[in-house]
Swiss-Prot record:
Domain of life of the organism encoding this protein: Bacteria
Family matches, as Pfam families: PCRF, RF-1
Recorded name of the encoding gene: prfA
GO MF: translation release factor activity, codon specific
Name of the protein this chain belongs to: Peptide chain release factor 1
Disordered: annotated span: 287-309
Length: 361
């Protein structure tokens, strides 16, 4: 890893020389490409500098521990060393992700659809918790977050929630969130203290780029209905027909949006979701045809595949696809997802490399 990092740091210096040359502005496409590369390599350098700094502190603490006699100081140093090791491990996971070569689709925006599954009200509440988790994660990454559609449950949380997230490396880091997320905890309404298990499903749909010619939707293939928006319990919240339902007749895909007061805005959001779903359906079809792609994936990305368990009583989160278990669920629910998303990106890349080596051997 060290050798690869040093190669990237050398490349960073080369990129900085190129983008500081005024002539680069004569080629906007090259400038855009170099700017993205510079941002990625700069982040790698920042994380690597943090690793070096943390490792120096760790080594200093170990040297101090070897000479320390005072029991209180020994206990303090041992605790600091344990925390330092955990931080270094976390930073290395982020580094591994940054060392994975970029994919042309890494920066595609995504639409995330969260739906309550088994568990009724508790599942709906967990959808709300995960919506907050992803919102906080988006904030820490500097991504733009917007609500596209939300169907609230009667006791709080959501039966369904659709959000749009845009920014650098959005698809790269969020694509492996697709699947079934299982939660184990004691509901607030549980008087016996029993742990209940419920689940939600998450779909991650990359939005087609504006110049993506593969997703063409003919207006003649659309059936558009308008109706009055309704809130929780079914009451009408608007006196005009602002809600929009769009049906794509060739595929049968149906999208409904009613969160905006403007019919025009609801239609625009519904079209975004529709395009993303149609693109996703086409990608799923291609992946099923390409066995090599399937075998190199981190899980199948299928909505029904159980990918992760959140156990609140143990403060534990486990990603079953890569055998990763962390005992910091409290931080994860506050949006600290980097250790998980980075590990998944790195694992997927190593699987792809291994699969390629097997084919060439």
């Amino acid at each position: 890893m060290e050798k690869k990092i040093l190669e990237y740091l050398k490349r960073l210096e080369e990129v900085e020389v190129k983008i500081s040359n005024p002539e680069i502005f004569e080629n906007p496409k090259e400038y855009s490409s170099l700017s993205k590369e510079h941002a990625r390599l700069s982040e790698l350098k920042n994380v690597y500098d943090k690793v070096l700094g943390q490792e120096k502190i760790l080594n200093d603490d170990k040297e101090a521990l070897a000479q320390e006699k005072d029991p209180e100081m020994i206990a303090m140093l041992e605790e600091g060393i344990q925390l330092g090791k955990a931080e270094v491990d976390k930073l290395y996971k982020v580094l591994e992700n940054l060392l994975v070569p970029p994919d042309p689709d890494d920066d595609l925006n995504v639409i995330m659809e969260l739906r309550a599954g088994t568990g009724g009200d508790e599942a709906a509440l967990f959808v709300g918790d995960c919506v907050r988790m992803y919102h906080l994660y988006a904030s820490t990454k500097g991504w733009k977050y917007e609500v596209l559609s939300a169907s609230e449950s009667d006791i709080g949380g959501y039966k369904e929630y659709v959000m749009g997230i845009s920014g650098a490396a959005v698809k790269r880091l969020l694509q492996y969130e697709a699947g079934t997320h299982r939660v184990q905890r004691v509901p607030e309404t549980e008087t016996q203290g029993r742990v209940h298990t419920s689940a939600i499903t998450v779909a991650v749909l990359p939005e087609p780029a504006e110049d993506d010619e593969e997703v063409f939707i003919d207006e003649k293939d659309l059936k558009i209905d308008t109706f009055r928006a309704s809130g929780a319990g079914g009451q009408h919240v608007n006196v005009t027909d602002s809600a929009v339902r769009i049906t794509h007749l060739p595929t049968g895909v149906v999208v409904t949006c009613q969160d905006e007061r403007s019919q025009h805005k609801n239609k625009a959001k519904a079209m975004r979701i529709l395009k993303a779903r149609i693109r996703d359906a086409e990608m799923q079809r291609r992946q099923k045809e390409a066995s090599a792609m399937r075998s190199a994936q981190v899980g199948s990305g299928d909505r029904s595949e159980r990918i992760r368990t959140y156990n609140f009583s143990q403060n534990r989160v486990t990603d079953h696809r890569i055998g990763l278990t962390l005992y910091n669920l409290d931080k994860v629910m506050e949006g600290d997802l980097d250790a998980i998303t980075s590990a998944l990106v790195s694992h997927a890349y190593h699987q792809l490399l291994q699969h390629g080596n097997e084919e060439n051997s």
